[in-house]
Amino acid sequence: MRKTIHIAFCIDNAFAIHLAALIHSLGKHLSQNFQLKCHILGRLNEDNIFKLTSLTSQNIKVGFYDDFPDYKEIPISSLYNNRLNEVTYYRFAIPEVLHNVEKVVFIDADMIAIGDISTLWSIDMMDSIVAVVSDHILGCDKEKQQVRGISSGRYFNAGFMLMDLGKWRENNISQQALKLLIDNNGFEHNDQDALNIVLQNKVLYLDEKWNAQPNHLAKKDISEPVLVHFCGQEKPWHVYCVHPFKDSYLVSRAETAYACEPLQTYLDQDDMDILSRLKNKFPDGARIVVWGAGQRGRRLCYEIIRNMDKYSIEYIIDKGVSGEFMGVEINHRLVKVAGIDAVIIASIPYRDEIIDEISEGSCLVCI
């Protein structure tokens, strides 16, 4: 008889397609001695329920839950309000919705399985309430941890948690975290901040392979990730995404009922402001250079090349990247200025430095 691993997910209709890819990948890599009981919290339409139910197999069982608070009274940080909504707070309902379950793995839907998660189920959590992985960025920011009232020196990413639901309920973790969020009118990193405050010194830190985030992968700290987390703005379902495990997501999705769905584009408010300034300054078109081949630079290049035919990108500048993107050459510096109307600065944190560098040798307009 197969042992059961309980897994909880919190989604809305927009993320059903990505959850399908995740669940399929979990089942594909799972040991034959186990089965997954997938608990999906979300107010989903009939089409998505039907498609997710089609994932059912010998080692995958699927259940749906929608009887829990909507959490709409809790604000979302301005840092995330263009890509997150109240669904991020649904995880607080897991212990009560799954009142007969004592242990569950919570996994964000923007992840993909590369290996077998079954060994996770046998981890001895000792007295810990959750087992987690350090956040790839905030885990190193001790100053911000202190500001948040976290004295443990550790900060975890809440997109993956092995939860002891018995201890969670006994310690009223959801209630404590929700009270903190309400009393503080939200936090910069929403539920993740609240959980790090409430759970400090009550967590077991695991190897990064269980929640392999971009900086972990960039540093090559992980030889064989089990769960890859596409955290951040750029996702593998974006047409311009560059990620070492993008294909793992696409292959898994292609084997689900969502196989024919197209890839997506995404622009945040800063992207739209940059493009608006470009159009206002050069309404009849322009020859431009894009400075920065990172996520924002790729988004802007894609939008300009595909949807703004009056504007041409002559080349891209990035001191850390070589090659090309969408047929546009990437250089390490300004290589020619003649005929260029403007430079779009996609590396916003370094905008002032870049403007100073451009101003030294040219009179180009900086957007």
Region spans (language model):
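Active-site-proximal specificity loops/subdomain of glycosyltransferases
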Residues: L55-E96
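GT-A fold catalytic core of metal-dependent nucleotide-sugar glycosyltransferases
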Residues: F68-D70, V87-L138, G153, L162-M163
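Conserved beta-strand elements of the Class I
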Residues: H6-A8, V105, L204, R287-W291
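Hydrophobic, well-ordered beta-alpha structural blocks that scaffold small-molecule cofactor pockets
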Residues: Y258-I367
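Short internal beta-strands
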Residues: Q35-R43, V132-S134, E314-K319
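A short, conserved beta-to-alpha structural element at the edge of catalytic cores
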Residues: V130-I150, E234-A254, Y258, K319-V321
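A glycosyltransferase accessory/donor-loop signature
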Residues: M1-A14, H18-A21, A158, M163-R277
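Short, acidic, metal-binding catalytic loop of nucleotide-sugar glycosyltransferases
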Residues: S25-N33
